[in-house]
Amino acid sequence: MDSWDQCPSDFSVAEFYGGDLEGVRQKLDYLQNLGVEVIYFNPLFVSPSNHKYDIQDYDYIDPHYGKIVEDGGGLLKDGVSDNRKAERYINRVTNKKNLEASNRFFAELVEEIHARGMKVILDGVFNHCGSFNKWLDREEIYQVSGDYEDGAFVSKDSPYRNFFGFQDQFAWPYNTTYEGWWGHDTLPKLNYEGSEKLYDDIMRVAAKWVSPPYNADGWRLDVAADLGHSPEMNHKFWRDFRKSVKTANPDAIILAEHYGDPKEWLQKGDQWDTVMNYDAFMEPLTWFLTGMEKHSDEAKPQLKGSVKDFEDSMRHYMASFQTSQLLCAMNELSNHDHSRFMTRTNEKVGRAATLGTAAAEEGIKPAVFREAVVVQMTWPGAPTIYYGDEAGLCGFTDPDNRRTYPWGKEDIVLIDFHRDIIRIHKEHEALRTGSLMFLKGDDNLLCYARFNRREQFVVLVNNKEQERDVELEVWQCGIPKKAVLERVIISNETGYSLMPKQYEVADGVLKIK
């Protein structure tokens, strides 16, 4: 791309802005100063796309993100789609010097991140790979390089033939009848039932990246419930995956992308540790504060401000978690699959393709976004910030939500707000591991407490523009019947403040005017 500020187009998988792991390294001071404790990377392994959910080689960091030490070769000419002629790309991603240098750089980066007291989570895409993958080699780039065995697309005698499910066993060479995830031929589904070698190789990969010298601190698992062709295989795979990972690194976390009830994978503690928390965080909070669906594809005004619906949803979906699983669940407001929360505050239904990218920034309500962040930082779970949210970045659902970070155009006040609320979250044990109690629910007014034996927090979220009087029976959460509470932060239409203010509790009741 010529312009850093240009928004991604609808078919932008081959558009690159030049970001890499060296750029992350240069911004570690910023992340550390913000209060970040864990960096979750979207896929980093070799892949032809910018999103990299179509992995080409599980054993190597993409040199475009890592290190290109040997370059050269011609570029594809305009109008040419034969990737066998993409000489420069082939050299970059198949040359072992580039691949090994990229792995070394990643190991060094993780070491530096660890030295700063932060951790690293990798994105694991094990349900499917990409059509460029060396095991399939539909684009024949590994065939061209001459240093690799034949891919399953190329030859029926490929050692990887059973890594994929082919419908036509007589269509070689160049067999296009392999199974694709959701029918996408660019995303070949991996056939674990058909290949013990594939199964074992992925178990090796799972352990490799959480072991020295790479020492990642865990995996986020893409479309984890889709893996395999039966529930039995799915659960067996994740049990074995857990054994491989935890044997290599007992402290590594395993969290899954999952929509719906995760109980099958969580209840015995033998598969996933936790999940990306859509049902028990992102969705109920989005409906309550904005009345919007998480892709901005639908509006339900009746849910906006409905504390009853919010509380009912939270109670129902949180019941699927054990406490330890809930406390480390990934609580996001935005991510790479959904519209950014700031854009949802404008309550516009649609996508960039129909409304235009500028519409994502029109009519946004930063005050509502700050409300969401307050809940995120005071709710049970691991608050997870999608890059740029803290700087005011907008965007409809993907790919528009994958805009570049707005360097030089950040909302500095919003960054300061995040830094302060993150600090508050980290300084108080009650906000991280304390009990949760709903105190009061009214039209657009949500009140709850987080508390333990040593400290108690009362959180009030008024989703109306008008100020209102509130009376709460706070004795229920362990606050003495006669006490003085101190305000730690307030956010409103004009901004936020850390100015302390005291409130008296009389007969166990807190009154706020």
Regions found by a protein language model. Give the residues of each.
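Carbohydrate-interacting/catalytic domains
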Residues: 1, 9-10, 17-37, 46, ...
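Substrate-binding/active-site clefts of carbohydrate-active enzymes
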Residues: 1-37, 44-213, 241, 247, ...
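Extended substrate-binding grooves/exosites of carbohydrate-active enzymes
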Residues: 13-20, 147-148, 155-160, 174-184, ...
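Generic structural signal for well-ordered alpha-helices
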Residues: 28, 106-110, 206-207, 235-242, ...
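Conserved, mostly hydrophobic/aromatic
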Residues: 31, 41, 58, 113, ...
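Loop/turn elements at helix/coil->beta-strand transitions in domains of secreted/extracellular proteins
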Residues: 32-39, 114-121, 215-219, 249-253, ...
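Conserved alpha/beta catalytic core and glycan-binding cleft of carbohydrate-active enzymes
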Residues: 132, 238, 242-243, 251-399, ...
